[in-house]
Design a protein with these regions (language model features):
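Short, Lys/Arg-enriched N-terminal segments with co-localized hydrophobic residues
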Residues: 1-6
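Eukaryote-skewed repeat-based solenoidal scaffolds used as protein-protein interaction platforms
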Residues: 16-219, 225
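Short, aromatic- and cysteine-enriched interfacial helices/patches
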Residues: 7-15
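Alpha-helical oligomerization segments
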Residues: 191-266
Length: 266
């Protein structure tokens, strides 16, 4: 695994001058910034993977860090110019660490929402998606109510890849209504026009709704910013087949993530 990650490192940093000058998706920082961020994250991943071989008693924590940092690598590479196959590989190579980091005492909702949303956007295989379904089902059964609420938004996304007779219906409310009720409203829209309106309304408020997130305003801090991408909004749009043409240039909406099939080079 270390080799695979370093292979990614070599492929990016060994790229030609012409490739270095290609435009990137993010509009707030340049390629050099993201290369620095990538180096920082890959170094962290390799460090914690090495710890995993020698310090088993902290396995849970190390697995969680590797899983989280790998999602950040996907974010960084998408902010640059990463394509479907590369991002899929990073996702699937890190999925086992995310699963091994299961902790019913301290679940982190945003990490789980990002992992599920990206699983949908990156078209991961059904057997891997079922691992996410089982993970959240287990969390719903084992986590203490004070720490965790079976969540309507997570299950809307998870159910989108399940057959009708497999869909779960036990979630009754949103775990984070302030942040998520606008997005859940999209899923309940009466028709495609209402869904698009609700989607546009929500993406317009998305950044400010996340002002308590650790990444908020991270572009103002040194070597912290990996991109502002609303993966969960794009995942809902994809599941619902919403015409998102008007959002193509929205700075928070990862349009390419929803439209890999239309990219002939992928």
């Amino acid at each position: 695994n270390v080799k695979r990650i370093m292979g990614l490192f070599d492929a990016i940093f060994g790229s030609s001058k012409k490739e270095q000058e290609q435009p990137i998706r993010d509009k707030l920082k340049d390629r050099k910034h993201f290369e620095k961020m990538l180096e920082k994250r890959l170094t962290s991943i390799n460090k914690y993977k090495a710890y995993l071989t020698t310090e088993q008693e902290s396995e849970l924590f190390f697995c969680r860090v590797v899983g989280y940092d790998s999602i950040d690598v996907i974010q960084i590479r998408y902010s640059m110019d990463g394509g479907l196959k590369e991002l899929q590989k990073i996702y699937l190579d890190s999925l086992d660490y995310f699963l091994r980091g299961f902790n019913s005492d301290n679940p982190i909702y945003d990490d789980i929402l990002n992992r599920i949303s990206l699983g949908i956007l990156l078209n991961i295989p059904d057997e891997n998606f079922m691992q996410l379904v089982d993970y959240v089902q287990r969390l719903d059964e084992e986590a203490k109510p004070a720490d965790w609420t079976p969540d309507l938004l997570l299950w809307f996304l998870l159910n989108s890849r399940l057959k009708d007779n497999e869909k779960r219906t036990h979630a009754q409310k949103l775990a984070f209504p302030r942040e998520c009720k606008g997005l859940y409203k999209v899923t309940q829209a009466a028709d495609s026009k209402a869904a698009l309106k609700a989607l546009k309304d929500y993406i317009g408020k998305w950044y400010d709704l996340n002002k308590d997130a650790s990444w908020y305003d991270s572009h103002l801090r040194k070597n912290c910013y990996s991109g502002y991408w609303a993966w969960e909004v794009a995942a809902v749009a994809k599941v619902m087949h919403i015409d998102d043409t008007d959002l193509k240039d929205n700075p928070y909406y990862p349009y390419d993530m929803v439209h890999w099939e239309e990219d002939k080079e992928e």
